[in-house]
Amino acid sequence: RCIGIHFFNPAPLMPLVEIIPAVQTDEQTLNGAVELIKNWKKTVVTCKDTPGFIVNRVARPFYGEALRIYEEGIADFATIDWALSELGGFKMGPFTLMDYIGNDVNYAVTESVFKAFYYDSRFKPSFTQKRYAEAGFLGRKSGRGYYNYTEPNSNKEANKDRVLGTYILDRVRCMLINEAIDAVFMNVGSPTDIDLAMTKGVNYPKGLLAWVDELGHKEILDQLQHLFDYYGEDRYRPNPLLRRMVANKTKFFPH
């Protein structure tokens, strides 16, 4: 009768609940948990007992790739946030969101997922975020994070160059999509539940799997392959399921 039930903060307001059956969970316990949470008017997704479940696993590149782009000197915090929010439709840019969550909390989640996946480079934490957390730049709660909340006029303005912005959006989005596809590939959850989790759990503008259907699987494969060829790092390796879907010309939601 053991089962995991994961709420999102703040629990009274956030609609999503992830239900995680353990190895020893029986069908009656699972069905009872699903019915209970639905009676509370929550949106339920069921997922495998793996690190990060659905949301905290699939969302890692939203923070990690944004930090990597900053560390490479491609764009500053404000420009990356502008690209993801204004061009991508995300409710908050990654640096605004990390400041809202708290750099200490967000870093700890990334580090725990990284360790739980046996140091898979896809989830590698950022030294930038580690140093900010160590310096006490925790975000809104400390008055200073990637942005200065006590002296907001000191923050840089975004460089609203659409070519640069499109590059940033494409790079972060293809990494998110690759992670969502990996969750399907590894049977973490169904395509429907994974998209539901990302739209209801972290307010993404679209489900990532519906998004790749819309953009084209070949387009996303090409973006990932370019990054993989350029950097030679496993974090950019396209998922085998994506390659198979391109070869077979299939979609997650054909209708």
Locate the predicted segments by residue:
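Positions in alpha-helical segments
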Residues: P15-E18, G64-E65, N178-E179
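Rossmann-fold dinucleotide-binding core
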Residues: R1-R57, K91-M92, N103
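NAD(P)-dependent Rossmann-like dehydrogenase/reductase catalytic/cofactor-binding core
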Residues: K38-D49, F53, L67, E71-H255
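Alpha-helix N-cap/N′ positions at the starts of helices
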Residues: P12, P61-F62, V172-L176
